[in-house]
């Protein structure tokens, strides 16, 4: 089964100080054990790198790049995903709903991905399921 991995989950896995770190690390481990097809977008990678570099420095970016990214497929946001995401963000008219989230939703729908590993309520609001079946 394919599982989308959001920036919020990536940050929680990477940062031992994150309030969701223990849950994120356990979930990530279970997803790997179950050989889930983990997918993120190039936009989420960019967002994660920017946040990790700012908060923790380049050694943490290296760790992300060498240790975490190799087990996650990167799906590239296409022009139609970007356009759909921008339209959804502007239509929603909610400051806290980002272009990265909206393009992720568009890509997930295009690829038929129903499950998301996240700590962001917007994925639930959009009807996506938790990363692991109950």
Predicted regions and their residues:
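Short, well-structured N-terminal submotif of metal-dependent ribonuclease cores
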Residues: 1-40, 53-66
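Short active-site oxyanion
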Residues: 34-38, 71-73, 112-114
């Amino acid at each position: 089964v394919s599982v989308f991995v959001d920036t919020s989950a990536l940050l929680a896995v990477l940062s031992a100080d994150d309030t969701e770190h223990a849950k994120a690390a356990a979930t990530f481990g279970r997803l790997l054990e179950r050989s889930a097809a983990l997918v993120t977008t190039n936009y989420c990678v960019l967002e994660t790198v920017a946040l990790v570099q700012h908060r923790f420095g380049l050694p943490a970016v290296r760790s992300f790049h060498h240790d975490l990214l190799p087990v996650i497929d990167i799906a590239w946001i296409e022009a139609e995903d970007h356009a759909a995401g921008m339209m959804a963000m502007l239509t929603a008219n909610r400051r806290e709903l980002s272009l990265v989230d909206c393009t992720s939703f568009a890509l997930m729908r295009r690829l038929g991905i129903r499950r998301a590993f996240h700590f962001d309520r917007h994925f639930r609001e959009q009807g996506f399921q938790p990363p692991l079946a109950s």
